[in-house]
Amino acid sequence: MELRLYNTLTRSKDTLRPLDPANVRMYVCGPTVYDHAHIGNARPVIVFDVLFRLLRRLYGEGHVKYVRNITDVDDKINARAAERGITIRDLTEETYRWFREDTAALNCLRPTVEPRATEHIAEMRTLIESLVASGHAYVAEEHVLFHVPSMPDYGRLSRRPLDEMVAGARVDVAPYKRDPMDFVLWKPSEAGIPGWPSPCGIATPGRPGWHIECSAMSWRHLGETFDIHGGGIDLVFPHHENEIAQSRCAFHTGVMAQMWMHNGFLMLEGEKMSKSLGNFVTIRELLAEWPGEVLRLAMLSTHYRQPINWTRQGLGFAAKTLDKWYRIIGEAEAETGEGNPFETEIADRLADDLNTPSVITHLHHLAEVAEHEEASSALRRRFKGAANLLGLLGDTETGWRARQKEAIALDEGVIAGLIADRLAARKAKDFKRADQIREELAAQGVVLMDNKDGTTSWEVSR
C-alpha cells in the first residue's frame, strides 16, 4: 500500500518513502503547558494520532517512533505562574497532567516519546554554538541570534515574500540585530525567571528561544533528518520555517524532515475562537458534556487540511452516529489485522492523505452491511475493527451507554441552560433554533417534555 500525504514543502501529495522503513520517524509540535488546552489544540492531537495508527499498521507497531514535545519553558508559563502565585514547576506539572487526561479521553495513543524542553538544554546549547561557529548565528548583548540572510533559501516552506515575512515574523525590533528577520536562539533571564548557563561564553544565565527547542528535541530523539514533521497551519511561519533554518544549517543537510504536514484552522460556530469574543472553549469543558469519542468523530468528519467549523449541531450528529454504530456492534470484539477486509478498505482511504471524511462515509456503508447481512456476527467484528483504525468504537455498547449517562450526569447545569435558551427561542418565535436545541439534547440521550404550565422538564432516555 502506498501512503500519499500532502507535503507543505512541495505543495503536492507525495508518496512517503521512509529513510528507514524499520524505523519510521515523526515529530509533532506539542502544547505549551500553562493552561487548559482548547478545542483547537485537540485537532493536531487527533489528526496525527490517526496518522500514527496508520503508520503502525503499515510498518509495524515496533517500527514507528512518534515524538510530540512538551514546551515547559516559555514567557507565558512564567507570567501564569506569577499570576497564580505558584511555582513554574507546579504549574507545568498540573497543566501537563490535564493535557494527558484530555488526550486520553479523546482516545489518543501515547506518543513514543514526549520530551520536555527543560530536559534538553544541553542539546540546545550544542546546536547554538555550532551555528555561531559556522557563521549562521552571532552573539549580541547577551543574546544569540540566527542570521537569516546566511541561509539563501530561507522561506522555502512558507513561500512568503520578504516584506510579508518581516511583517509576520513576530520578532522584536532590536538595535543589536544585524537584520530585521534575525530571530532569537538564546536570551538572558531576569531575576526570578528560569535560567541556565548560557552558550558561547555569555556570563549571564539565560533561556532558549522557542524555535531552537524543537530543533534540539527532534535531533535528540529522531536524528538530523527524519520522515514527517507535523503541526497546525499557524506554525508554518515563523516556527517551522525557523526550525528548518536552524537544523539544516547546524547539520548541513538539504532537508530537516521529508514531509511537512499541517492541519487547518478551527472556527467555533462560524467565528474565530477567542477569549475576547467570549466563545473560547476548552477540551475539558466539552468533555463535561460529551464523551470524548463524540469530539473525535466530529473532528475527523472534516478533512484535516480544511478549516473546520466546530458546532453543537456537528457534535449532535456525531453522537447520533456513534449511538447507531454501538447499537450495531453490541458487545462484539474487534477483528483487526490483514485478515479483516473492512480494515483494509479503511486503510486504503486513509492512505490518500488521511481522507477521514471518505473513511466515515464508508463506515456508514459498512454499518448498513453489518446491520442487515445474515452473517452479522462476523461482520460486526470486522466493522468494529475497521473503525478502530480511526480510533473509534473501542468500547462495547454497554460501555458507550454508561459513558453517555456519565457525561449527562455531570452536566445538569448545561442542560438547564439549553432548556432556557430553547424557551427564549420559542418566545421569540425562532422555532428553528428551538427544534435544533431539542435535537442536540436528544442526541445526548436527553428527552425534553413541554409541560402545560409553560415549563420544560427532561429525562435520560437510555
UniProtKB/Swiss-Prot annotation:
One Pfam family matching this protein: tRNA-synt_1e
Cofactor binding mode and count: Binds 1 zinc ion per subunit.
Catalytic activity: tRNA(Cys) + L-cysteine + ATP = L-cysteinyl-tRNA(Cys) + AMP + diphosphate
Classification of source organism: Bacteria, Pseudomonadati, Pseudomonadota, Alphaproteobacteria, Hyphomicrobiales
Chain sites annotated for binding Zn(2+): 29, 214, 239, 243
Disulphide linkage map: none
Species: Xanthobacter autotrophicus (strain ATCC BAA-1158 / Py2)
PANTHER family per the UniProt record, alphabetical: CYSTEINE--TRNA LIGASE, CYTOPLASMIC, CYSTEINYL-TRNA SYNTHETASE
Broad enzyme group: ligase
Family from the record: Belongs to the class-I aminoacyl-tRNA synthetase family.
Alphabetized GO MF terms: ATP binding; cysteine-tRNA ligase activity; zinc ion binding
Protein name stated in the entry: Cysteine--tRNA ligase
Known EC number: 6.1.1.16
Gene3D superfamilies: Cysteine-tRNA ligase, C-terminal anti-codon recognition domain, HUPs
Keywords annotated in UniProt: Aminoacyl-tRNA synthetase, ATP-binding, Cytoplasm, Ligase, Metal-binding, Nucleotide-binding, Protein biosynthesis, Zinc
Motif 'KMSKS' region location, chain numbering: 272-276
NCBIfam families to which the protein is assigned, alphabetical: cysS (TIGR00435)
HAMAP family on file: Cys_tRNA_synth (MF_00041)
Presence of keyword Metal-binding: yes
Cellular location(s): Cytoplasm
Binding site for ATP: 275
Motif ('HIGH' region): 31-41
An annotated GO cellular component: cytosol
